[in-house]
Amino acid sequence: MASVFGKPRAGGGQQSAPLEVNLAILGRRGAGKSALTVKFLTRRFISEYDPNLEDTYSSEETVDHQPVHLRVMDTADLDTPRNCERYLNWAHAFLVVYSVDSRQSFEGSSSYLELLALHAKETQRSFPALLLGNKLDMAQYRQVTQAEGAALAGRFGCLFFEVSACLDFEHVQHVFHEAVREARRELEKNSLARPLFISEERAVHHQAPLTARHGLASCTFNTLSTTSLKEMPAVAQAKLVTVKSSRAQSKRKAPTLTLLKGFKIF
Ligand SMILES: Nc1nc2c(ncn2[C@@H]2O[C@H](COP(=O)(O)OP(=O)(O)OP(=O)(O)O)[C@@H](O)[C@H]2O)c(=O)[nH]1
């Protein structure tokens, strides 16, 4: 069966079902994951938040004239990847964030890229990842050069961008849309035309031996018996609440976004 996306619409009259893309934002504490997520969803920069809050948001996007139902998981690991299966088994693509003014966060992003590489090896699938050097507005306090970011991305074969959650929305939006494009490419490659979430599907648990060898925090990988299907994270980990976006202020269209509780938006 042909892929449901990436094809021109037949007949012009029929609307294709929106492509469903799950995106997980990974990175060390303070790298700016929440700020980037909220910037993308609301065009606003937040400066206060609850660092322990992990939530999944959804947004109806249009990428390359195609409707996309995008879910964004703003993860809240502590200092290292933990209980990674909640996003490894869920996301179609990953944004790995570090802060250009923090060498520590850059090293943290390298751990996340390694984790993704190991997961890809374990599952024999590839997972698009984009490396983001955030807080570009703080470039005068740089601890990580652009060349270092590009080199790390090159090592893992992923796209690289420097961004700022404080600066222009369009650049942040571009990066998220690039992640959607990457996910779409991968999904098309795998000819995934089946529904993405089948709750009856049983996960076969096995311990990933690679994590210990690579000094990563303990992670258990779930390999689905049908490897092309992914499970939604447990309800406790993914709270979807629809609210109106500030973008809806344009009266023409009111895209729905999901919850921003826990964030103070100015
Ligand atoms: N100057 C500047 N500050 C930023 C930027 N992005 C985030 N911050 C600030 O950096 C701090 C951490 O940002 P968060 O978005 O909460 O970082 P996080 O990665 O989600 O951190 P955890 O929630 O602890 O995992 C906050 O004080 C933000 O206001 C940015 O692009 N520029």
UniProtKB/Swiss-Prot annotation:
It holds the Pfam family Ras. It catalyses: GTP + H2O = GDP + phosphate + H(+). Its EC number is 3.6.5.2. GTP binds at residues 27-34, 74-78, 134-137. GO terms for molecular function: G protein activity; GDP binding; GTP binding; GTPase activity. InterPro entries: P-loop_NTPase, Ras-related_GTPase, Small_GTP-bd, Small_GTPase. Keywords: GTP-binding, Hydrolase, Nucleotide-binding. GO terms for cellular component: plasma membrane. Belongs to the small GTPase superfamily. Ras family. PANTHER family: RAS-LIKE FAMILY MEMBER 11. This is Ras-like protein family member 12. It comes from Bos taurus (Bovine). The lineage of its organism: Eukaryota, Metazoa, Chordata, Craniata, Vertebrata.
